[in-house]
From Swiss-Prot:
Organism listed in the record: Thermodesulfovibrio yellowstonii (strain ATCC 51303 / DSM 11347 / YP87)
PROSITE patterns, A to Z: GLUTR (PS00747)
UniProt xrefs under InterPro entries: 4pyrrol_synth_GluRdtase (IPR000343), 4pyrrol_synth_GluRdtase_dimer (IPR015896), 4pyrrol_synth_GluRdtase_N (IPR015895), GluRdtase_CS (IPR018214), GluRdtase_dimer_dom_sf (IPR036453), GluRdtase_N_sf (IPR036343), NAD(P)-bd_dom_sf (IPR036291), Shikm_DH/Glu-tRNA_Rdtase (IPR006151)
Site, Important for activity: residue positions: H106
Entry keywords, A to Z: NADP, Oxidoreductase, Porphyrin biosynthesis
Subunit structure: Homodimer.
Gene Ontology terms describing biological process: protoporphyrinogen IX biosynthetic process
Lineage: Bacteria, Pseudomonadati, Nitrospirota, Thermodesulfovibrionia, Thermodesulfovibrionales
GO terms, molecular function: glutamyl-tRNA reductase activity; NADP binding
Binding residue positions for substrate: T50, C51, N52, R53, S116, E121, P122, Q123, Q127
Record's protein name: Glutamyl-tRNA reductase
Length: 429
């Protein structure tokens, strides 16, 4: 058996590759999970897909040698190629593969926001939880990944509570605002249009209002959703069909939609710029896939930054949180060890259950013999004897149970010896 994670993220792959591999909806993830769980060697599977990463976590079924583990890896690569209609050669070199201890430690880092573009941003924990819930709904997890994902979320909670890594919350949206503030001195005099009413757009809006912005416009394909957020933040909702007209009178545009295509095209801006007398317009595209055609950046007075361009802002946050990240890493390592203690204890569970079942069987048989011999005993005394014998069994079984659960170098010999000592092998024969 083996735990494997195969993926790519903002550190290993540019946005052009990530957007080709991303699963852009819950339905896409569900479809992918259904396909993967049918593949040979895959016993359990969870997919995490965000703006900055795509990762597939697998608990392999009946795979105990390196050759077959490699076959599972190739199976996943082939699946990604077929599902996204992209040649393996286009993305293979950007992938990372972690197994067993490294895989568990990596997941715990991801859930705790230690592997994020901005260390400490809280959104990833919720995204990991949602990814797990989708896998649960599709029944592609069982004992191992259920426990692993729950421990990942528990680890993230420990990191959040036991370190200061979450102080002054940051996110990709916050980094976008930081970039805007470097360019414009007085945000209160500028107008901003948010294209998209999802989580990322709302986060950006909160940060902008906190920075003094007042002239906020918001457009979304679902106008009702745009109105709801605009009302909450004293902004103005703009019908999506009026996007081009709104660009004429906007200084800054932040795009964060789930559209699989360009929402703002080069041709659109060629028509818009003369109408705004070629005044500079500033775009930040934090969508994956990208919503603003990269060709727009070639137009005069159009300044376009995508999610990868936020790295400079991100770096300053990483430096500030480095000390807290070191504390968090010690928590991750501690929880990784605990996970494998639990995993290793599973080897002895069948033996422990068999020993306890045998002890209980003997106890019940002896009580029945006792009751048959002393038929006139009051029920209260029988109940006391039943309780007493249960207590004796539990006390006798405590030390063997602890010994079998604990990790040790010769655990296989210990399990073998326990089976022989308690006569389990002879019963099965």
């Amino acid at each position: 058996m083996s735990l494997i994670v195969i993926g790519l993220n903002h550190k290993t792959a540019p946005v052009e590759i990530r957007e080709k591999i991303a699963f852009n909806s819950k339905e896409a993830i569900k479809e992918a999970l259904k396909e993967l769980i049918q593949r040979e060697g895959i016993g359990e599977v969870v997919i995490i897909s965000t703006c900055n990463r795509v990762e597939i976590y697998v608990y392999t079924a009946n795979v105990s040698d390196l050759k077959r583990e490699n076959q599972v890896e190739e199976t996943i690569k082939a699946f990604l190629s077929n599902f996204h209609n992209i040649e393996i050669g286009e993305f293979e070199n950007y992938l990372y593969v972690y197994k067993d201890t490294e895989a568990v430690e990596h997941l715990f880092k991801v859930a705790s926001s230690l592997d994020s573009m901005i260390v400490g941003e809280p959104q990833i924990t919720g995204q990991v939880k949602e990814s797990y819930e989708i896998a649960l709904s599709e029944r592609t997890t069982s004992l191992i990944l259920n426990y692993l994902m729950n421990r990942a979320l528990f680890t993230a909670k420990r990191v959040r509570n036991e370190t200061r890594i979450g102080e002054n919350p940051v996110s990709v949206s916050y980094a976008a605002v930081g970039l805007i503030k470097k360019v414009f001195d007085e945000l209160s005099k500028k107008s901003i249009l948010l294209v998209g009413a999802g989580e990322m757009a709302e986060l950006a809006l909160r940060h902008l209002i906190g920075s003094g912005i007042k002239n906020v416009y918001l457009t979304n394909r679902t106008f009702q959703r745009a109105e709801e957020i605009a009302k909450e933040f004293n902004g103005v909702a703009v019908p999506f069909g009026n996007l081009k007209e709104q660009l004429v009178k906007t200084d800054i545009v932040i795009c964060s939609t789930g559209a699989p295509h360009y929402v703002i095209t080069e041709q659109m801006l060629k028509e818009v710029m003369p109408l705004r007398k070629h005044k500079p317009i500033f775009f930040i595209d934090i969508s994956v896939p990208r919503n603003v055609d990269p060709a727009c950046n070639e137009l005069d007075n159009v300044y376009l930054y995508n999610i990868d361009d936020l790295q400079d802002v991100v770096d300053s946050n990483i430096l500030e949180r480095k000390k807290e990240a070191e504390k968090a890493l010690s928590i991750v390592q501690e929880e990784t060890e605990k996970f494998f203690q639990w995993l290793n204890s599973l080897e002895s569970v069948p033996v422990i259950v068999s020993i306890r079942n045998k002890a209980e069987q003997v106890r019940q048989e002896e009580i029945e013999k006792f009751k048959a011999k002393y038929k006139d005993l009051p029920p209260e005394l029988i109940n006391s004897i039943d309780y007493l014998t249960q207590s004796i069994i539990n006390k006798i079984m405590h030390s063997p149970t602890v010994a079998l659960k604990n990790n040790c170098e010769n655990k296989e010999i210990l399990i073998f010896s326990a089976r022989r000592l308690f006569g389990l092998d002879s019963e099965e024969e």
